[in-house]
Amino acid sequence: MIILDNRFVTPLSIEEDIDIEYNLRPTQLEEYIGQSKVREKLRIFIKAAKNRGESLDHVLLYGPPGLGKTTLANIIAKEMKGNLKITSGPAIERAGDLAAILTTLNEHDVLFIDEIHRLNRAVEEILYPAMEDYALDIVIGKGAAAKSIRLDLPHFTLIGATTRVGLLTAPLRDRFGVLCPMEFYNEEELKDIIVRSSKILNVKTEEEAAYELARRSRGTPRIANRILKRVRDYSEVMGDGIIDLNMTNKALNLLEIDKEGFDSIDTKILKAILDNFNGGPVGLETLAYFIGEELDTIEDVYEPYLLQKGFIMRTPRGRVATEKTYKHFKREIKKENINQYKFKI
């Protein structure tokens, strides 16, 4: 059984990302690279809210991890001149935990709830009047003697972030006025991020090298910055500190990140579908068990990039390796699979 521990190119935040992201994170919307549709929405709605002297309507950011949801929350708070309070769905275990947070908010503050799809129902119901009416309903007493008291809350902005928007309940989703789908970044955008980060880190990165780093960053800024830091280390020890194409290729080979941005785990996943399941279809639960990982982790962390790059496809019967996968591993493509799934790469 394959164990997926300490994966270098995971889009999830790891300990070393904390300092990197804090130093490299843009603080204004105009500095934010990529996500042009989201930026334009937020620019307009923030300006309109400020012109009226109101809080920004509640915002839902959704998409794969590592694409800049927390960064946008920080920017929104700064633009609205409010404080940012950060928490997560799993951290709010009881309704009282959320009530305690809500009562500390001030006018125009921003409450950022990561993994909002993991809120339990009792906690979620506290949010409904808070989002709609800026009010907190508290029940005092028990049984027949119980009574409800409504407390007014300041006008705040709730920003919810999720990788699984389909798991949000309709009542919660419908209370967000600004919906922002986050997409993987293209190579040009990632190259610009790498160039910007290189300047902040005071390291010279040649354009060719920046493009190569972008190509192998899985469409994810968090991974791009993490890889940049490791290639910087390699170039300082094995070269003159300048990140050129040669140094980049050597460092990425050492890190076992191939031309598609795949690491050894991606390769094992794809080869498992090809070799152990005859190219598919294979159910996600079966695949997760085979590679020794949780179902949600496969679906949230690993699969989105493989789907986006066209190396696997979803079918009603399970996941299937595409024609592109066969070509990548120089395997003979089975005619029955081509005819059955009508690959379009």
Swiss-Prot record:
It is found in: Cytoplasm. Residues 4-185 are annotated as: Large ATPase domain (RuvB-L). Mg(2+) binds at T70. CDD domains: AAA (cd00009). InterPro entries: AAA+_ATPase, AAA_lid_4, DNA_helicase_Holl-junc_RuvB, P-loop_NTPase, RuvB-like_N, RuvB_C, WH-like_DNA-bd_sf, WH_DNA-bd_sf. Pfam families: AAA_lid_4, RuvB_C, RuvB_N. ATP binds at L24, R25, G66, K69, T70, T71, E132, D133, Y134, R175, Y185, R222. One of its GO terms (cellular component) is cytoplasm. Its main location: cytoplasm. It is an enzyme of class 3 (hydrolase). Its EC number is 3.6.4.-. Residues 259-345 are annotated as: Head domain (RuvB-H). It catalyses: ATP + H2O = ADP + phosphate + H(+). GO terms for molecular function: ATP binding; ATP hydrolysis activity; four-way junction DNA binding; four-way junction helicase activity. HAMAP family: DNA_HJ_migration_RuvB. Homohexamer. Forms an RuvA(8)-RuvB(12)-Holliday junction (HJ) complex. HJ DNA is sandwiched between 2 RuvA tetramers; dsDNA enters through RuvA and exits via RuvB. An RuvB hexamer assembles on each DNA strand where it exits the tetramer. Each RuvB hexamer is contacted by two RuvA subunits (via domain III) on 2 adjacent RuvB subunits; this complex drives branch migration. In the full resolvosome a probable DNA-RuvA(4)-RuvB(12)-RuvC(2) complex forms which resolves the HJ. NCBIfam families: PRK00080.1, ruvB. Has 3 domains, the large (RuvB-L) and small ATPase (RuvB-S) domains and the C-terminal head (RuvB-H) domain. The head domain binds DNA, while the ATPase domains jointly bind ATP, ADP or are empty depending on the state of the subunit in the translocation cycle. During a single DNA translocation step the structure of each domain remains the same, but their relative positions change. The RuvA-RuvB-RuvC complex processes Holliday junction (HJ) DNA during genetic recombination and DNA repair, while the RuvA-RuvB complex plays an important role in the rescue of blocked DNA replication forks via replication fork reversal (RFR). RuvA specifically binds to HJ cruciform DNA, conferring on it an open structure. The RuvB hexamer acts as an ATP-dependent pump, pulling dsDNA into and through the RuvAB complex. RuvB forms 2 homohexamers on either side of HJ DNA bound by 1 or 2 RuvA tetramers; 4 subunits per hexamer contact DNA at a time. This is Holliday junction branch migration complex subunit RuvB. It comes from Clostridium tetani (strain Massachusetts / E88). The lineage of its organism: Bacteria, Bacillati, Bacillota, Clostridia, Eubacteriales. The gene is ruvB.
